[in-house]
């Protein structure tokens, strides 16, 4: 397997994954969504709330605020040595919110959550939590823990995880007369004419949706274009919520997938040994 970075910015990446099949890509995608842990508020103790929001709605909103995650410093609650429902400083982070509207209406933002760990904070300071009327107040303490998306979507480290087969477009230059009809109909502008206008060229083939509209409008018979996809090369699009860098998400997913494969082989070996003893 080989992974190449086609595009990347602070929150998203487009990767080209080679020498794998659909089964592998589907497993990787599901693990990214459901099993790579991230930090999220899991419990809220409301001390005072005179806003229009019910306590449970307020807690729900807090739970959906993405938090920056430190996988190296914290344990999953079920793996922590404290074995406590309350948690400890190795599996839980406390955040407080103490705001009051005063004489005017105001909006409470995620920037006003105060964390005991400066590394575990909301990914954005501009996420609105509630709107307070005059003299209304919210005072609470929230507890964030590591969790997995398979339990609740608030623990998913990504907002997008999708893949497709890498497109494959072949141009038969002997048949193509550069009429330009395929260029006009291509929704992703993958096809273009050369500067001289006498030759059909490809650009950004990774954007091709394999719609085959270009093949349908080609006036030659047979068409001068062949559009298909590579069976063992894929394009993986990932958009992080900001909880973890994209690279860390992919690496953690690959580690988890590798552990699952090792466990399966181990169990398979044990099963074969048991059957051999019976025989």
Give, region by region, the residue ranges found by the protein language model:
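Protein-protein interaction/assembly regions in multi-subunit complexes
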Residues: 1-279
